[in-house]
C-alpha cells in the first residue's frame, strides 16, 4: 500500500486552521500541521497492514478449551468525525484440534484493525471474522467497550458513556453456558 502523504495532510490542516479563523503562522501553531500529519501516519498505520498475517503461525498444543485475552486497550478514529474513540477489547476463542495462536497475536489483530478510520462495530466484526477464517476455531467471541469522543465533546455531549459491541461466532453463538463463561471471566478481576 502506498505511504501516507504527510505534506498533503499538513497542507489540509493549514487550510482548516485558516478556515476557523486561526493564523497557522503564529508561534503555537507553526509546526502543528506537520505534527498532525505525523500523528495521522501513526493512528492510521493499520491502513498499510494486513491483520490476518498475525495468524500465519499456529501452534499445535492440544488445548481445546477456552482461551480469553481481556482488557486489550485500543484506540481508533471515528470515520464519521475523525475524532478518537478508545477502550478495551475482550477476545475469546475455542480452539479446534488444539490449534492455538500466540496470545500477543490477538492484541496485534485488534491494533491493526483499529488503526484506521473506523467504526467500532466493524472492528468487532472484522476481528471475529479474521480469527474464524485464519485460526479456524470452534468459535470466537469479541466484545469491545469504548468511549467515543464524537459523543463526549460534541453533539450530545455525554462524557463517560460507553458503547459495547459484540461479535459471536461458531460454538459461542449456540451455547449459552459457554457464552456465560466468557462474560463471567470478563467481569472477574
Curated annotation (Swiss-Prot):
Protein name: GTP cyclohydrolase 1
UniProt catalytic activity: GTP + H2O = 7,8-dihydroneopterin 3'-triphosphate + formate + H(+)
Similarity comment text for this entry: Belongs to the GTP cyclohydrolase I family.
Gene name as annotated: folE
Listed Gene3D superfamilies: 1.10.286.10, 3.30.1130.10
GO terms under biological process: one-carbon metabolic process; tetrahydrobiopterin biosynthetic process; tetrahydrofolate biosynthetic process
Organism: Listeria welshimeri serovar 6b (strain ATCC 35897 / DSM 20650 / CCUG 15529 / CIP 8149 / NCTC 11857 / SLCC 5334 / V8)
The UniProt record lists the keyword Transmembrane helix: no
Molecular function GO terms recorded: GTP binding; GTP cyclohydrolase I activity; zinc ion binding
Record-listed E.C. numbers: 3.5.4.16
